[in-house]
C-alpha cells in the first residue's frame, strides 16, 4: 500500500485543482479557511468543546486547534498559520511535523489576533470560509465573499468523491470503531450498564466523548426504539434482552459510523429477526453499483422489510407489494437507508445533483432520506436498515382499515426489545462495492 505521505500529496493536488476551478468560476483570488474559535458557555468562562471547520480539516489533519488559518489559491503551496501561543494555563499543541507537512507551508501564529498583519494586504478578492463572519469583516474581507454559497456548494459537491488518502483514513477509522464494537458487545454480555458499556467502547477506540464523530448511541432493551438515544443509564436493567450500539470513530478528521444489534438470547423470535435484518442488509449491498440512484436502494429495502414483516407474522394477510404501497413498512423503518459519510458523519451534498448545487429533495413518502444522488465511484455511504417497535409511530395504525393486518400481540411481545439496526460503511468503485466494515470481519 502507498504511504500516507504519498497519498496525501495526491490528495492536496486534487484539492488544489478543485480550488483553481472554484476560484476561476467565482472570480476570486484565494480562499482563507478558518479552523474556528472557542466559544464560551453563556455567562461562563468555560468553552464548549472545539469542533473544527470541516472545510479546514479537508486540507490538513488538524482537528483540535482553534485560531488556525489556511490560505489556498490552487497554485502556490497551501499556507497554514498554526496557532502556537505562549500559554501556561492550557495545553499547547506543538508545531506539526508529520507526513503532511512537506506539502503545506506551516507558520507559527503566536497570537490569535495576529493574523491580520500576516495576510496579503489586498483582500477584497479573497473568500472566507469559516464559522466567525465578524472575524472576516475585521480582516477586511468583503461581506459578499464571506462563506460564498457558490464556492461552498462547488467544494461540497466534489467532497462526495473521496481521494485515496481520504479512503485510507476512513479505513483506519473503521478499524478503531470495530475494536470499540467488539469491546462493547463483550461489556453487554457481561451485564454492564449503558454508561459502563460506553466507557468500554471509548477505551477500546482511544477516544474521549468529545472525540467521537457523534454522540454514541448505547441502547439496551426498549431504549433501542429511540433512534438517537444518548442518555446512558448508570444502572443495568434487571433483564438484558437486547443491545443496539450506533457508534463511530475518527481518524485524521474522517469518520466511521457503524451500528450493530445483539440479542441476549440466541433462541427467540427477536434473535431471528436480528439475523434476518442482517442478511437482508448484506443482500442489498450485494446489488449496489455505480450509476443507480441511492433512492432506489431505499425503496428496495422497504420491499425487504415487507418480506420480513410477513415472514415473522408481524403483518398478516397482506401482500408485500401492498404493504409498501400503503406504507405499512413506514412505522417499522422511519429513517432513510443511510447517508453520505466522510469529514462529517452526515456528509455534505447528499441532495446535490451537480456542482452548482442543484437540489433534489427526498421523495415525499420518505422525507428523512438523506441522499438522492446517483451513485458514482469514490462515494462513501452508510447502509443502515432497521426495524423498530415505536409506539408513537404504531399508534395511528391501531385504528382504521389496516389495523387488522397488524399482529398486535406479536408487536407487544417485541416492543421490550426496542428495535434493530445494522449499519455498514461502503465505498462505491467502478466495478464493485467495497464494504469497509465487513472487510474487518465485524459480524
Swiss-Prot record:
Q: What is this protein called?
A: Xaa-Pro dipeptidase
Q: Which GO terms describe its cellular component?
A: cytosol
Q: What does the entry list as the binding residues for Mn(2+) 2?
A: 246, 257, 423
Cofactor annotation remark? Binds 2 manganese ions per subunit.
Supply the alphabetized keyword list.
Dipeptidase, Hydrolase, Manganese, Metal-binding, Metalloprotease, Protease
Quickly give the catalysed reaction.
Xaa-L-Pro dipeptide + H2O = an L-alpha-amino acid + L-proline
The source organism is Escherichia coli (strain K12)
Single GO MF descriptor: metallodipeptidase activity
Q: Gene symbol?
A: pepQ
Q: Where are the transmembrane segments?
A: none
Q: Describe its function.
A: Splits dipeptides with a prolyl residue in the C-terminal position and a polar or nonpolar amino acid at the N-terminal position. With much lower efficiency, also catalyzes the stereoselective hydrolysis of a wide variety of organophosphate triesters and organophosphonate diesters. Is able to hydrolyze the organophosphorus insecticide paraoxon and the p-nitrophenyl analogs of the nerve agents GB (sarin), GD (soman), GF, Vx and rVX.
Question: EC no.?
Answer: 3.4.13.9
Q: Please state what class of enzyme this protein is.
A: hydrolase
**Cited Pfam families:** PepQ_N, Peptidase_M24
Q: Tell me the cofactors it needs.
A: Mn(2+)
Family per similarity comment? Belongs to the peptidase M24B family. Bacterial-type prolidase subfamily.
Q: Which HAMAP family match?
A: X_Pro_dipeptid
Q: How is it used?
A: Can be utilized for the kinetic resolution of racemic phosphate esters.
> In which residues is Mn(2+) 1 bound?
257, 339, 384, 423
Question: What is one Gene Ontology biological process annotated in the Swiss-Prot or TrEMBL record?
Answer: peptide catabolic process
Question: Any extra detail in the entry?
Answer: Has a stereoselective preference for isomers with R-configuration at the phosphorous center of organophosphonate diesters and with S-configuration in organophosphate triesters.
InterPro entries registered for this protein in UniProt: Creatin/AminoP/Spt16_N, Creatinase/aminopeptidase-like, PepQ_N, Pept_M24, Peptidase_M24B_aminopep-P_CS, X-Pro_dipept-like, X_Pro_dipept
Amino acid at each position: 500500500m502507498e504511504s500516507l505521505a504519498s497519498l496525501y500529496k495526491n490528495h492536496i493536488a486534487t484539492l488544489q485543482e478543485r480550488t483553481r476551478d472554484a476560484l476561476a468560476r467565482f472570480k476570486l483570488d484565494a480562499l482563507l479557511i478558518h479552523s474556528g474559535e472557542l466559544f464560551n458557555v453563556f455567562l461562563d468562562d468555560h468553552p464548549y468543546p472545539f469542533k473544527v471547520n470541516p472545510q479546514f480539516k479537508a486540507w490538513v489533519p488538524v482537528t483540535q486547534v482553534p485560531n488556525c488559518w489556511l490560505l489556498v489559491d490552487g497554485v502556490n503551496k497551501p499556507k497554514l498559520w498554526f496557532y502556537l501561543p505562549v500559554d501556561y494555563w492550557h495545553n499547547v499543541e506543538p508545531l506539526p511535523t508529520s507526513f503532511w507537512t512537506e506539502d503545506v507551508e506551516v507558520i507559527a501564529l503566536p497570537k490569535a489576533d495576529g493574523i491580520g498583519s500576516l495576510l496579503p494586504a489586498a483582500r477584497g478578492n479573497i473568500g472566507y470560509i469559516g464559522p466567525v463572519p465578524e472575524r472576516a469583516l475585521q480582516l477586511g474581507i468583503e461581506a459578499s465573499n464571506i462563506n460564498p454559497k457558490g464556492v461552498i456548494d462547488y467544494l461540497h459537491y466534489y467532497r462526495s468523491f473521496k481521494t485515496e488518502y481520504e479512503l485510507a483514513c476512513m479505513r483506519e477509522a473503521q478499524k478503531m470503531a470495530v475494536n470499540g464494537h467488539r469491546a462493547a458487545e463483550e461489556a453487554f454480555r457481561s451485564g454492564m450498564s449503558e454508561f459502563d458499556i460506553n466507557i468500554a467502547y471509548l477505551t477500546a477506540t482511544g477516544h474521549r466523548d468529545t472525540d467521537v464523530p457523534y454522540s454514541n448511541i448505547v441502547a439496551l432493551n426498549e431504549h433501542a426504539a429511540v433512534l438517537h438515544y444518548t442518555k446512558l443509564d448508570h444502572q443495568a436493567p434487571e433483564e438484558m434482552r437486547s443491545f443496539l450500539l450506533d457508534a463511530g470513530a475518527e481518524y485524521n478528521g474522517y469518520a466511521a459510523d457503524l451500528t450493530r444489534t445483539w440479542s441476549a438470547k440466541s433462541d427467540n423470535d427477536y434473535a431471528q429477526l436480528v439475523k434476518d435484518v442482517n442478511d437482508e442488509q448484506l443482500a442489498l449491498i450485494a446489488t449496489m453499483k455505480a450509476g443507480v440512484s441511492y433512492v432506489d436502494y431505499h425503496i428496495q429495502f422497504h420491499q425487504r422489510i415487507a418480506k420480513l414483516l410477513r415472514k415473522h407474522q408481524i403483518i398478516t394477510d397482506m401482500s408485500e407489494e401492498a404493504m409498501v404501497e400503503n406504507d405499512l413498512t413506514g412505522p417499522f423503518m422511519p429513517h432513510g437507508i443511510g447517508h453520505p459519510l466522510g469529514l462529517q458523519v452526515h456528509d455534505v451534498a447528499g441532495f446535490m445533483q451537480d456542482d452548482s448545487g442543484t437540489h433534489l429533495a427526498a421523495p415525499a413518502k420518505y422525507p428523512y432520506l438523506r441522499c438522492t444522488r446517483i451513485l458514482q465511484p469514490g462515494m462513501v455511504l452508510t447502509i443502515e436498515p432497521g426495524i423498530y417497535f415505536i409506539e408513537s409511530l404504531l399508534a395511528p395504525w391501531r385504528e382504521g382499515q389496516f389495523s387488522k393486518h397488524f399482529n398486535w400481540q406479536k408487536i407487544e411481545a417485541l416492543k421490550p426489545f426496542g428495535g434493530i439496526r445494522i449499519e455498514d460503511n461502503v465505498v462505491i468503485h467502478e466495478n464493485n462495492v467495497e464494504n469497509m466494515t465487513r472487510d474487518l470481519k465485524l459480524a
